[in-house]
Each structure stands twice: as C-alpha cells, then as structure tokens.
Design a protein with these regions (language model features):
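Ligand-site clamp/hinge motif
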Residues: 255-256, 287-334, 474, 482-484, ...
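N-terminal lobe/hinge region of extracytoplasmic solute-binding protein
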Residues: 85-87, 99-155, 186, 262-266
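Gly/Pro-rich hinge or "lid" segments in bacterial periplasmic/extracellular proteins
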Residues: 124, 131-142, 234-294, 299, ...
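A structural "hinge/loop" feature
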Residues: 107-123, 147, 174, 226-236, ...
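Aromatic- and charge-enriched surface segment that lines or borders ligand/interaction sites
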Residues: 43-50, 149-194, 213-218, 311-314, ...
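Extracellular/periplasmic solute-recognition and catalytic clefts
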Residues: 188, 207, 270-282, 303-367, ...
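Surface-exposed binding/hinge segments that line
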Residues: 94, 163, 198-247
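Detector for C-terminal structural segments
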Residues: 15-24, 60-72, 77, 81-85, ...
Length: 623
C-alpha cells in the first residue's frame, strides 16, 4: 500500500535539514577557526624567527638599520668560525631556506632520551637537537668554538675552562648558561640515572663547576681526549631535566622514558616529551636558534625502514633524500641513468665509519664459553674468509680489518699481518684447544663430547649481514664447527647486549682518526650496561690502554697504541671483519653536498652546522 506524504513528515524532514545545516555551519566555523589558528601560529613563528635573527645581529655587533638579512656583508669574527662554511653557503645566489630533508634508519630506534640511548641512530638525531661547547671543521679538523666563545687549558692539562656565549637560549626560550653545562655532567654522573656507558666515558672528569659565564672541567690525570670529551659533552637544560634527580622515583621515570629530548640546537622535537618507538622521527626548525646562520631545512625527518629492499624502493620513489646503498646496489645504481639523473652518487672512506666485527662472548649465564679459549677465537678468525666477503659480497667497496684502529691514521700498527683464510690452521688450533671429531660425524667435539656449536646474533632486515653470516656458516662447517644464524630486531639485539645473552654477535663500531678502546675492551667495562659485553678481561691490555690514554704527547702515545693493537691481534676477542666504503646518494635538488676529510658534509657530526640547502624553485615540501 502506498503511503501518503503527511504533515508530520514535512516537519521531520525540515528538522533533519536544520540539523544538517547546523552541522555544516559548525564545520565551516571550525574550519575558519583552524585557519585562524594556523595563521596565528605562522605569525608567531615568523615573529620568533625575526627575534632570533635580531638576536643573531646583536651578537654580531651589527647596526640594526634596515631589514635583517640571513647573510649580510659582515666578516665572521674568530669566535664564530664554526659557522663559516654554513655562512658561505647562505651567500650563494640560489640559497633558500625551506623544504624537508628526509633520511632513513635500517632499524627502529628504541629511545631518543639522552644518555639512555647507546646506538648510532639515536645519536644522529640528538646531535641536531642538543648543542655542544665546540665543533670541528670537516675539512681541516680544527676545533672551533660553538656554544663556548673561547677556552683555556692549564699547563698540566688537568683543567679546561670554557666561556659560554651570552644571550643563548634553549628551544623553549629559556636561557642557556654555564650552569646548564655543569648540570649536564652532574646529571649524567648521578647513579640514579641509567647511564653507565656515559659515566664510563666521562670517568676521568672529577668535577665540573660553573662561575658566571665560565665552566671548568677538572680531570684526575692527563688524558689525550680531555678537550674533546669536555667540549663535545651534550648540554642539557637544567629546568627541563633537573626534576628527574629529585628522587629515585623521578629518576626511574627518566630511565623508562623514550622521548625526553630538549636542547638548544638548530632543530627541535615537535613535542620534547611524547615520542615513542615506532613513531616517525620528525624534527622542526628551531626558530629560537642562536647560531650565526639558522637551519636551512624546515624539517629533518628519519623513517624507520627495516628491510633493505624497501629502503631502495622508497629512495627510487623519492620518499627519502639520502640513501646509503649496499655495494651490489651501488654498482648497478651508478649505471642507471634514471637514478643518476635525479641523485648524485658519493663514494668515500669515512674516517668515522668504523668497522664491522664478530664479538665472541666468553662468559654466558655464569659459565665460560668455548670462546674463553684464545685458540678457539683465533681459529674462528682463520675460518672467516674476510677477503672473500669483501670481494663477493661487498664488491670490493671495503678493506679487510685486522683491528679497531683506522689504517689510514697513525694509530694502527703497520707491522701486523692480516690473517688469511686457512682451514688447516684453524683445525690445528681447535685440536690444541681439545676440539676434534671424536665420533667421525664431521663435527668437532670437546673432551666431554659437546659439539662446537653456537649462534651468531645480528640485526635482522639487512641483506648484507644475512649474506655474510650464511657464507660464514658454510665456511665454518669445513672445520667441523656448527653455526646457526640468529637475526633479531634492533630492540631485542640491544637487550641481548645489555644482558650479555648471546654466543657471538656481529655489529659495528663507529671510528675516528684516533679512538679509545677503553670503553669496549677494558676489564672494568664488563659491569652491567658496560660496552665490554663479551666479558673479556686482560690485565696486560688494561695497563697498555691506561698508559696510552694518559700520554698527552702524540709521538709517545702512538707506540703505546701499537702495542694495544698487537695484543688485540694476538688475542682476537673480536674477529675484525671489514671497513666499508660509504656509498651514498643524495637528491640532486640538494645543493652544496661535498666530501671532506671528515666524510660527507652532512652537518650534525660534532654538532657542525648544516651546509646543504635546496633552491626555492626546486623545493618539493612545504609546511
């Protein structure tokens, strides 16, 4: 039966129409409000930027007549030379601020909170947010003042005083003072804070005291890296982090945190408290930045892409601007015109690139492992065909390593011969250690009949690691040694390191022109949280490291490091695998990308100001 349209239906439809109109008007009003808020925020940001520019002009001693410009005609004073290269870039005819710089990490970052993070990835982010007293010229390697405007060193080398610049502020607008520098050391050294690695690194400092604009670092004894240690210490704001020292409970709150990150650097977190593992790592330009030149990019972003193939796809699709290629990829990509037309390749040995290694754990769950025997460790090195890894997996873009020291510098012992692949020698050493094939099943066993079998733990998602470990599995079995690959996600791997819960592990250490191996080889660093996670203890090595560390004269120090190198070469606590070339592509819209003595001039390293930029006509991202 057909229903007639009645009066009450008209009333109902009219009521519904009124509701819809009200909703539409409300949405329109909300949209206008959001637009107003966005405009207001833009004005606030612009005013904050102008104030920061005015502050920079005042610091330069400029006469404030006429409009403020990023690059004026002033000559940089000596105490602002850290910004000389960035200042030169800002004077280029096509220079412009804006756009985003997007990179990627091959693993998920577990925490961005200072002192709690022990991985390279979190450090890369922190360097853009947290300032240091000094920085370094990437071409000359000369130390330059940054937050400090000058320094003085006592004749005995035990006291270093830095004078902090006037008028500096953190990204929340609060002033940065010498007291914040002193607080940063006291915060880190407080036993309530879970920072054993950093406490070990800064253990030579006996006190840090502020007096006006001066802050003085006092050392217990001479140490060759004293100036670098003091000058590169992260400067934390006391007003933000100080509350976490109030009690054990507040310290535990800090220790459990993942995203407490606030500083005075050229970039800042959108929120300095809310970041969690799995979130996009996104920094925005610090509009209150005090430096001579402000940050060129509007945003600095890192994506977590844990599969190599996915990283390459993201790079080819333009989703990331800087891509570190695997050797096989690089060989093919540099011949791909579609890639090179949009991205510029760079190939170089980064002095800070460090080395890849296999570390042999000597004590697990309170019991000695087979790797507690030096002969077993040496046998494993003979079974590791490192030249084949370099040739077949790394396509020749690497050097075989025979120790922790940079072979391009003075610290490496030039008289040490790199062990070559030798199955017969490995079998002989294993037999000396009591491992022979007792039941003729092709596997060597101990005197108790226990097969020599273990797992190698390594980061999952990396094809290079996977290929290396699978090759080693085939090589080791030639001597009757059974190895099982154990790929794990980065947070799981960090937990295994902290708990010393692994048989063997393959990772990398960053390097430098001269490094200190106290952190990962001294017996004292086997404590929980220390970086001697393989439980290797050698009093002879401890003494050599200590002697080298306290020798201030480089000509006398290098022979001591050569002795350290010789002992590590003999003991083989690690099997040092290789030092890779950096094989990097950067989007061609990014200008002023160069290879310097310190590597690619990406900025951030040693808190160096960013020198890259994108001309306005080539920018692809906006706010």
């Amino acid at each position: 039966m057909i229903q007639r349209f009645q009066k009450r239906d008209l009333i109902l439809y009219t009521f519904m129409l009124a509701i819809l109109v009200s909703i539409w008007l409300a949405m329109f009003q909300i949209d206008r409000q959001w637009h107003f808020i966005a405009q207001t925020q833009d004005k606030i940001d612009e005013q904050t930027r102008d104030i920061a520019d005015l502050r920079r002009q005042i610091q330069r001693g400029a006469v404030l007549s006429g409009p403020v410009s990023e690059a004026d005609s002033q000559t940089l004073p000596a105490d602002w030379q850290a910004f000389a290269r960035a200042d030169d870039a800002s004077r280029a005819a096509d220079y412009a601020r804006g756009d985003w710089l997007i990179s990627s990490f091959p693993s998920q970052v577990p925490t961005l909170t200072p002192f709690l993070s022990g991985d390279t990835y979190s450090s890369n982010v922190q360097r853009w947010v947290i300032d240091t007293l000094i920085t370094r010229d990437p071409a000359t390697l000369e130390w330059l003042p940054l937050v400090a405007e000058k320094w003085s060193i006592s004749d005995d080398g035990l006291s270093i005083t830095f004078t902090v610049r006037e008028g500096l502020v953190f990204s929340d607008g609060q002033p940065l003072t010498a007291q914040d520098v002193a607080f940063s050391w006291h915060f880190m050294m407080d036993e309530k804070i879970a920072a054993p690695r950093d406490r070990s690194y800064y253990s030579r400092i006996t006190s840090v005291e502020s007096n006006g604009r001066d802050v003085t670092f006092q050392f217990a004894e001479p140490y060759f890296e004293s100036f670098q240690i003091a000058g590169l210490m992260a400067i934390l704001p006391e007003h933000f982090y100080g509350k976490y020292l109030e009690s054990v409970a507040t310290a535990e709150e800090f220790n459990r945190s993942t995203g407490l990150l606030l500083g005075s650097g050229p970039y800042r977190m959108v929120s300095p408290t809310d970041w969690k593992p799995g979130d996009l790592i996104e920094l925005v330009r610090n509009e209150r930045y005090w430096g001579w030149v402000s940050a060129p990019f509007e945003r600095r972003i890192w994506k977590s892409i844990q599969v190599d193939a996915a990283q390459l796809t993201e790079f080819k699709n333009g989703g990331i601007d800087v891509y570190t290629a695997r050797p096989l990829e690089y060989r093919d990509l540099v011949q791909d015109e579609a890639v090179t037309s949009g991205a510029q390749p760079f190939e170089y040995y980064d002095p800070r690139g460090g080395y890849i290694y296999i570390a042999w754990n000597q004590l697990r769950s309170g019991s000695a492992t087979p790797f507690a025997d030096r002969r077993v460790r040496e046998a494993m090195t003979y079974l590791t065909d490192r030249q084949r890894i370099v040739d077949e997996i790394l396509m020749g873009y690497a050097l075989v390593a025979n120790g922790p020291f940079n072979p391009l510098g003075k610290q490496a012992n030039p008289n040490l011969v790199t062990r070559q692949f030798d199955v017969a020698k490995a079998k002989s050493l294993l037999a000396e250690a009591g491992y022979i094939d007792r039941d003729r099943d092709g596997v060597v066993e101990s005197e108790q009949g226990v097969p020599l079998s273990f797992k190698i733990t390594y980061p999952s998602g990396s094809d290079n690691y996977k290929r290396v470990v699978l090759l080693l599995k085939d090589l080791y079995v030639k001597a009757g040694v059974l190895m099982e690959p154990n790929p794990v996600d980065w947070p799981v791997l960090i937990t295994a390191l902290n708990n010393k819960d692994f048989d063997a592990i393959s990772l990398g250490w960053t390097g430098d022109f001269e490094i200190d191996v106290y952190q990962n080889m001294h017996s004292s660093q086997t404590e929980p949280g220390g970086d001697n996670f393989i439980n290797y203890k050698n009093p002879e090595l401890d003494g050599l490291i200590e002697n080298a560390r306290r020798e201030m004269n480089e000509d006398l120090r290098m022979p001591l490091w050569h002795q350290v190198h010789a002992l590590l070469w003999r003991e083989q606590p690690y099997t040092y695998l290789f030092r890779s070339k950096s094989l990097v592509f950067s989007d061609r819209r990014i200008q002023n990308v160069k290879v310097e003595r310190a590597g690619l001039n990406t900025g951030g390293l040693w808190s160096m100001p960013m020198e890259w930029y994108v001309p306005s006509g080539q920018q692809k991202y906006s706010r």
